[in-house]
UniProtKB/Swiss-Prot annotation:
Name under which the protein is recorded: Arginine--tRNA ligase
Subunit structure, as described in the record: Monomer.
Family indicated by similarity: Belongs to the class-I aminoacyl-tRNA synthetase family.
Record GO biological process: arginyl-tRNA aminoacylation
Gene this protein is translated from: argS
């Protein structure tokens, strides 16, 4: 309906242009759903937008626009509201058509081709394989997976990718942590990984030969001097003593943790088309090649034995090291190579979803893209805020090194996948989130996911008791009470809500809409009877709630949440 209103407004503005009232008619005309039924179904601010250019006050211009609209059977009336809004009241016959459209299109209703098949590479989570995913990763996972689903629903082709940080010093710290647990030394570095999962991995390498010959007791003295230098010495000594067995331990640790991450994500309903290894960039020499390319372009200089990239030339606040004085490439060098590799795959758009703690990393990544002569606007970076998890009113701590973090798996086991997926995306991604476990587990109207699922289950219960209504000779005009009008108005909003959620990367908009729709249904359920003697009214009401049910299913599916038939 919005498209039709835009069309008739455009025709009216063209007439005013021909009459000399306007110099030119705009291409884009904004139409919004009204919040108050007394203000109509849709409203446009076009008169206020064009008032200054026309030399007319908004209400006068609005009247001229209305006078040129002509007759339209889809519109009951058009009114002007202060300070110049044009409000459209849609005819009841037009409004109720949405019910048949939803039922006929079923799971396809709401889908669009706005994206026209544009290809998007969406990278998200990409947590280091140094431990299980925690609840913070869970929010990024739920957000990323839902954004991907929404974009696909409006016509984009989306590939989900996980960047595996399986190279560098953190991997060595992981290997030494596992080995020290294997040899059961009493001394353990404070900056090693200490979770129970480290012990579990260590048990799996008990059969490897010669692993009982390792580091002298003197060299494992706890935190001797500088902690970072100490663990680096342990790593170097471990590599020397173990030889090829060191890589066996490292590979075992990475593969075990990565396998757990993959299982966790699949069970959470988060699927990836591609897993990209950082180590592959090292093995292929791409990181080295990129630094050489930047060097040849004059963007690299040497200082204090290290190689620095002049990112300040491209808007960054500081220059950045790409090769340390020991000759090792930094994570930033790998990230530059990775992003270049992404750009060369031919996607129309590249989206990274990062934790908000990576905010300072945006400028340097954008700088590297510009330096390599690519369009940095092709890359969008979305940030997700931290999660505060509360259990029994107490905030839980999350720290990978200490091993005391709450894992995503533990959260899912406690509240269930549906509650976790829904709660994670219920607030804007840029806002801090307080995850209330007690609320997520409650079976009450205050729990939004329960509230929505209960609406679906209630509809299923009614339909089980009723004979299947026939679309033949259906008369939807009998749906004329206030509750029915509100439900029909909400159903008419779904397409716009879906597109807005997708194009603005805002799943919470769809989640909040579903909660509102469920609320209107519950009110209708409490105040109305469905299995009435009047067949015409009975069938119309059943078709209305079938349409509501379909929208609840469609919306929940996009959010990665189930729609149970009973609760």
């Amino acid at each position: 309906m919005k498209e039709q209103l835009q069309k008739i407004l455009k025709q009216s503005l063209n007439l005013l242009e021909n009459e000399g009232v306007l110099e030119s008619a705009p291409e884009n005309i904004r139409i919004d759903h009204t919040k108050d039924k007394t203000q109509g179904d849709f409203a446009s601010n076009i008169a206020m937008v064009l008032a200054k250019r026309s030399g007319l006050i908004p209400k006068v211009l609005a009247q001229k626009i209305i006078d040129n609209l002509g007759d339209n059977t889809q519109i009951d009336k058009v009114q002007i509201a202060d300070p110049g809004f044009i409000n459209f009241f849609i005819s009841q016959g037009e409004s109720v058509q949405i019910i048949e459209q939803i039922i006929n299109q079923a799971e396809h209703y709401g889908k669009a081709d706005v994206g026209k098949g544009q290809r998007i590479l969406l990278e998200f989570v990409s947590a280091n394989p140094t431990g299980p995913l925690h609840v913070g990763h869970g929010r990024v996972a739920a957000y990323g997976a839902t954004v991907a689903s929404l974009l696909r629903a409006v016509g984009f082709e989306v590939d989900n990718e996980y960047y595996v940080n399986d190279a560098g010093r953190q991997m060595d710290i992981l290997a030494i942590s596992v080995y020290l647990r294997y040899v059961e030394t009493e001394q353990f570095p404070d900056n090693g990984y200490k979770g129970d999962y480290i012990f579990d991995i260590a048990k799996k390498i008990s059969g490897v030969k010669k692993l009982d010959i390792f580091i002298s007791q003197r060299s494992v003295k706890k935190n001797a001097g500088n902690k970072e230098k100490h663990i680096d010495r342990l790593i170097a000594n471990c590599k020397f003593q173990l030889g090829h067995d060191y890589k066996k331990i490292l590979d075992l640790a990475i593969n075990n943790i990565l396998s757990g991450i993959k299982i966790d994500l699949v069970e959470f309903g988060v699927k990836y088309q591609q897993w990209f290894s950082e180590q592959s960039l090292m093995d292929s020499g791409l990181s080295k090649e990129i630094v050489k390319k930047l060097q040849d372009s004059g963007y690299i200089y040497e200082k204090e034995g290290a190689l620095w990239f002049k990112t300040t030339d491209f808007g960054d606040d500081l220059d950045r090291v790409v090769v340390r004085k020991n000759g090792k490439y930094t994570y930033f060098a790998s990230d530059i190579a990775y992003h270049l590799e992404k750009f060369e795959r031919g996607y129309d758009k590249i989206i990274n979803i990062w934790g908000v703690d990576h905010h300072g990393y945006i400028a340097r990544i954008k700088a590297s893209i510009k330096a390599l002569n690519h369009n940095s606007n092709k890359l969008e970076i979305l940030l997700v805020q931290f999660v505060n998890l509360f259990r029994n009113g107490k905030k839980a701590s999350m720290s990978t090194r200490s091993g005391s973090f709450i894992t995503l798996e533990e959260l899912r086991e406690e509240v269930g996948n549906d509650a976790a997926r829904f709660f994670y995306i219920l607030s804007k991604s840029g806002q801090h989130m307080n995850f209330d476990l007690d609320l997520a587990k409650s079976k009450s109207n205050e729990n939004p996911v329960f509230y929505i699922q209960y609406a679906h289950a209630r509809i299923c219960s009614v339909l089980k008791q009723a004979k299947s209504p026939s679309m033949v000779d259906i008369d939807l005009s009998v749906l004329n009470n206030e509750s029915e009008a509100l439900l029909i108005k909400e159903l008419n909003r779904y397409k716009d809500i879906l597109q807005s959620s997708a194009l603005n990367y805002e799943p919470h908009v769809l989640a909040c809409y579903l909660r509102e729709l469920a609320g209107h249904f519950h009110s209708y359920y409490n105040n109305s009877k469905f299995l009435v003697d009047d067949d015409k009214l009975r069938n119309a009401r059943l078709f209305l709630i079938i349409a509501v049910k379909q929208i609840l299913v469609n919306g929940l599916n996009l959010l990665g949440v189930s729609a149970p038939d009973s609760m």
